[in-house]
C-alpha cells in the first residue's frame, strides 16, 4: 500500500485519539512497529536508565543500525577538541548566562513569578534561548559534575516551572493581552510556541540524563499531556497543529525514547503529516518546511534551520516506525543537499532573505548566510541518518561541518559568535549587514541569539558523537585523543583508546581492550577525502581499504590489540561544479578535514584586502604547524601572484592591453577557516582565483 493519503483525508479519518488516527494511515509493517513501541522502554530497563542514554537515544529504535554511546562514557583527552570544550565550559557557557540575564531572558520568567518588575523583553522565541543554554549545561554535567553550574541551573529551573499554569501551558511571551493569541492558526505559523516547547523538552531531557533530575522534564510532560494532547490534534473537537518552526517533532520523539509513551510518537507523526484544516499559502509551506506530509517533499527549500530540524524529526520518526516513504524522501533530500546546497565548509543556507536555501548551485561567498544553527541542524540530521544506515557518507558530512562551518561559529576565546558564516568578508564592506554591525562578524550577543547556546550545546555533547555500537561491534566515527569505556551488545565491557595529532597529522593509533577476549567487529571510518590509506592491526597490513567507508575489522580482540590508521594529508585544491558561478576559476584549499582561507593581514603586502591574488594551480603547498598562532594551527603557504593595475586603468579595458596590469610573484598564506576573524579586522576569502604556471 503506497502512501497517498492527503492531509484532508488524514484528518477526516481521525478516530478517537491521535494513536489510531496515525496507525490507520500506515502500512501494516509500520503500524506493527508503532504498536510495539514501548515494549522495551527506558523505565523497564531500571531506575538508572537515564545514565545510559546517548545524545539521540536510538538504543531501542527498531530501525536503527547503530546504538549511541553516552556522553559520560567518552573522555575527550588533551588534543584538538579538548581546548574547544574547555573554553566552552569555562568561558562560553558562563558568559552566555550573563548575557541572557543582562538582556532580560530570565526576567521574563521572574516577572510572572512576581520577582521582577521588568517588562517582557525579546522576540517571541526568547524562552528557547534559556532552554538551549540549559541543554548545554545538561551535556556538560553528563561529562562530570560542576557544582556551581549545576546550582545555577537548578535555581533557574525552579523559576521556570514556578510560572507553569494549571493547564500545563508555559510560555512567557503569550501573557497579559497576548493570551488570546495562544496557538491561533496565524500565530502557530510564526509564533514559536511549539518551538520553545521543543527546546524546553530537549533541555529537560539533557538535564535528566545528567543527574536524574526530573523537575523540568515533568513540567514539559505536563505541557504536552495537559495542554497539547487534549486540545490539539486530528479529532473534530480539536484544533489542528502546524509547527511553524520545526523542532517539536524531534523533541517529541526523544520524549518517547525517554518515557516509553507511544502517544508522543503519534503526535510527532501527526505534526509531520500536516493538517489541512490550517489554511496555508504555498509560500508558507516552503518557508516553514512543514504543513504538508513530509514524504511529499522533493527538495530542500525555505528557511534552512527549519528544513534541517524538520529532517531531524522525520528521521527520528523513521527510526521508530520504519516508514519507507520517509526513508526515500530523506535520501532524496540528502542527495539534494550534497549535490546542490552544501558549502565546502559544511555550511548551508545561501540567502539572507528568509535565511533560506537558494536554487541549485546558488552558493555565494560574501553574501553566504551559512547560519551557525543551520550547520548544527545539518550535523544533527546526518547523525540520525548515520544511526539509521551505518554509512560513512553521513559521517563525512558531519566531520566537514564540525571542523569548519560549525567550529567557525565560536571565537577561540569562546565569548563572541558568528550568526552567519560567509566564505568571503570585508569588514569595510556592506554596512547593511545586520549580523556584522560596524564590520564585526563576531559578536557576544544577537537579539536573535539562537546560535550561541546552540554552539554551546553542540560542543558540550561532542563526546556522544565519537563512537557507536552495533549488533556486531563498535563504530569509530571521529578522531581525536579520546577514550570510550562502554559495553558491547552482549553486555561485556570494552575500552577504546585513541592517540593522535589529528587533524594536523593523519596517523591514529587505536588500542582495543575488552575486559575479556571477545570476537567482534571494529568498524573504523576511512574519510572520503583521503586518497591513500594504510591500516595495520598489531602491525599487519589490512587489505581492501576503501575511502569514504567504514572498514570492518573482525577478530578475536584481546586487551592491548592495536589498530594503526594512516590517512593521506596531502593538501587538496578543490574546484566547484561549473554551475556554481561565484567559484568558477577559483579553488579552495583543504588538508585533512580542515578547509583553509586567506586573511588579508597574513599576506606579504599587508594591504588589508585580497584583490588580485591568484594561486598557481600546479603549485605545491608547504605545511607548517605554528604553535603560537591562533591557539596552534597548521599554516599553508602556496605559490601564486598578486596583480596590480596601472594608475590610469579604467573600470574596463581591452583584453589585449597587457600593460594595464602587472603581476608579481607572491606566496599565499592560509589559515584554517574556523580560526578566521580572531585577530585584527581583516578581509577573508575561502575560494581563491587560480592560474597556471
Regions found by a protein language model. Give the residues of each.
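Secretory targeting signals
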Residues: 1-5, 32
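N-terminal export signals
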Residues: 9-33
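C-terminal beta-rich recognition modules with glycine/proline-rich loops and embedded aromatic residues
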Residues: 37, 41-53, 268, 330, ...
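Aromatic (Trp/Tyr) and acidic
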Residues: 42-147, 151, 181-210, 246-263, ...
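Asp-box/WD-like beta-propeller blade repeats and closely related beta-sheet repeat scaffolds
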Residues: 176, 180, 184, 188-191, ...
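Hydrophobic, small-residue-rich alpha-helical packing segments that form membrane-like cores
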Residues: 221-293, 299-307
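Beta-strand-rich binding/interaction modules
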Residues: 519-537
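Short strand-turn-strand beta-turns centered on an Asx-Gly dipeptide
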Residues: 536-540, 592
Amino acid at each position: 500500500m503506497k502512501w497517498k493519503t492527503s492531509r484532508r483525508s488524514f484528518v477526516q479519518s481521525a478516530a478517537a485519539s491521535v494513536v489510531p488516527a496515525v496507525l490507520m494511515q500506515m502500512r501494516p509493517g509500520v503500524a506493527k512497529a508503532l504498536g510495539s513501541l514501548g515494549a522495551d522502554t527506558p523505565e523497564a530497563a531500571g531506575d538508572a536508565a537515564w545514565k545510559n542514554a546517548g545524545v539521540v537515544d536510538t538504543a531501542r529504535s527498531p530501525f536503527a543500525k547503530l546504538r549511541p554511546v553516552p556522553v559520560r562514557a567518552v573522555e575527550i583527552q588533551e588534543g584538538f577538541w579538548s581546548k574547544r570544550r574547555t573554553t566552552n565550559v569555562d568561558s562560553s557557557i558562563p558568559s552566555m548566562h550573563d548575557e541572557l540575564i543582562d538582556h532580560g531572558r530570565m526576567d521574563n520568567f521572574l516577572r510572572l513569578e512576581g520577582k521582577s518588575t521588568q517588562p517582557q523583553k525579546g522576540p517571541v522565541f526568547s524562552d528557547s534561548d534559556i532552554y538551549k543554554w540549559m541543554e548545554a549545561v545538561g551535556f556538560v554535567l553528563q561529562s562530570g559534575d560542576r557544582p556551581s553550574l549545576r546550582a545555577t541551573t537548578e535555581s533557574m529551573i525552579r523559576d521556570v516551572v514556578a510560572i507553569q499554569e494549571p493547564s500545563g501551558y508555559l510560555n512567557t511571551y503569550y501573557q497579559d493581552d497576548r493570551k488570546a493569541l495562544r496557538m491561533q492558526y496565524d500565530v502557530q505559523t510564526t509564533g514559536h510556541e511549539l518551538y520553545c516547547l521543543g527546546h524546553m523538552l530537549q533541555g529537560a531531557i539533557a538535564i535528566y540524563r545528567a543527574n536524574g533530575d526530573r523537575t523540568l522534564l515533568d513540567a514539559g510532560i505536563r505541557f504536552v499531556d495537559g495542554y497539547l494532547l487534549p486540545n490539539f490534534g486530528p479529532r473534530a473537537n480539536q484544533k489542528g497543529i502546524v509547527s511553524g518552526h520545526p523542532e517539536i517533532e524531534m523533541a517529541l520523539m526523544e520524549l518517547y525514547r525517554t518515557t516509553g509513551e507511544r502517544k508522543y510518537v503519534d503526535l510527532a507523526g501527526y505534526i509531520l503529516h500536516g493538517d489541512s484544516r490550517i489554511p496555508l499559502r504555498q509560500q508558507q509551506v516552503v518557508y516553514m518546511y512543514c504543513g504538508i506530509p513530509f514524504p511529499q517533499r522533493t527538495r530542500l527549500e525555505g528557511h534552512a534551520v527549519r528544513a534541517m530540524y524538520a529532517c531531524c524529526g522525520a528521521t527520528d520518526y523513521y527510526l521508530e516506525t520504519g516508514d519507507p516513504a520517509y526513508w526515500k524522501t530523506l535520501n532524496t533530500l540528502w542527495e539534494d543537499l550534497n549535490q546542490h546546497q552544501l558549502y565546502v565548509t559544511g555550511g548551508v543556507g545561501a540567502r539572507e532573505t528568509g535565511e533560506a536555501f537558494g536554487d541549485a548551485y546558488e552558493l555565494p561567498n560574501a553574501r553566504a548566510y551559512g547560519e551557525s544553527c543551520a550547520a548544527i541542524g545539518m550535523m544533527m540530521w546526518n547523525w540520525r541518518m548515520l544511526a539509521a544506515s551505518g554509512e560513512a557518507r553521513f559521517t563525512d558530512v558531519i566531520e566537514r561541518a564540525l571542523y569548519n562551518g560549525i567550529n567557525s561559529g565560536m571565537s577561540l576565546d569562546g565569548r563572541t559568535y558568528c550568526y552567519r558564516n560567509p566564505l568571503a568578508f570585508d569588514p569595510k564592506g556592506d554596512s547593511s549587514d545586520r549580523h556584522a554591525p560596524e564590520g564585526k562578524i563576531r559578536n557576544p550577543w544577537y537579539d536573535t541569539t539562537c546560535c550561541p547556546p546552540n554552539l554551546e550545546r553542540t560542543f558540550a555533547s561532542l563526546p556522544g558523537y565519537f563512537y557507536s555500537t552495533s549488533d556486531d561491534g563498535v563504530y569509530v566515527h571521529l578522531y581525536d585523543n579520546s577514550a570510550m569505556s562502554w559495553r558491547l551488545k552482549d553486555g561485556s565491557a570494552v575500552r577504546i583508546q585513541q592517540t593522535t595529532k589529528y587533524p594536523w597529522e593523519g596517523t591514529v593509533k587505536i588500542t582495543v581492550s575488552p575486559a575479556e577476549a571477545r570476537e567482534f567487529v571494529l568498524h573504523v571510518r576511512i574519510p572520503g577525502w583521503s586518497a591513500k590509506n594504510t591500516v595495520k592491526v598489531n602491525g599487519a597490513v589490512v587489505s581492501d581499504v576503501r575511502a569514504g567507508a567504514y572498514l570492518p575489522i573482525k577478530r578475536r580482540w584481546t586487551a592491548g590489540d592495536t589498530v594503526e590508521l594512516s590517512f593521506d594529508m596531502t593538501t587538496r585544491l578543490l574546484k566547484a561544479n561549473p554551475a556554481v558561478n561565484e567559484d568558477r576559476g577559483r579553488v579552495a584549499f583543504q588538508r585533512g578535514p580542515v578547509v583553509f582561507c586567506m586573511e588579508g593581514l597574513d599576506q606579504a603586502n599587508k594591504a588589508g584586502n585580497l584583490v588580485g591574488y591568484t594561486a598557481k594551480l600546479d603549485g605545491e603547498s608547504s605545511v607548517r604547524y605554528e604553535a603560537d598562532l591562533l591557539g596552534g594551527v597548521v599554516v599553508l603557504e602556496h605559490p601564486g601572484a598578486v596583480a596590480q593595475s596601472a594608475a590610469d586603468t579604467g573600470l574596463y579595458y581591452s583584453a589585449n592591453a597587457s600593460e594595464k596590469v602587472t603581476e608579481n610573484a607572491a606566496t599565499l598564506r592560509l589559515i584554517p577557516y574556523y580560526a578566521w576573524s580572531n585577530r585584527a579586522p581583516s578581509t577573508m576569502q575561502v575560494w581563491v582565483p587560480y592560474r597556471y604556471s
